[in-house]
Amino acid sequence: MNQDISICVLTENEMGWTEPFELDKVQILDNYYLSAQKSDIAFLKKMDTARLLAGFRTTAGIDTKGVRPYGGWEDSLLGGHCVGHYLTALAQAVKVTGDKELKEKSQTLIAGLEECQKKLGTGFLFGA
């Protein structure tokens, strides 16, 4: 059996090296990408910080008040893993948009993680 495969070999950029830039210096003008950004922000706003913190709180011995973690990875031995990705997404979205609700979510999440870290007393965080 034969199969054709295409390979793309990247060569050095004709413009030379690119320079780093701040996210808030980028302006999205294309409607497709603006729509994608709005969808991403709406998704970030739907995430429940209490559910994201539930595994960390359980591990630290802090009452979750009946709140359960999200399913999938968050309800397994990888629990808490997604929180780092979520914090990165929040930080980037706040940098780009200045959205106060997302900034508040990030502050709530960080405060919750700090509470768990202090309760454990080891400096360690574990969300599973």
Residues of each region from the PLM?
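Glycan-recognition and catalytic cores of secretory/periplasmic carbohydrate-active enzymes
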Residues: M1-A128
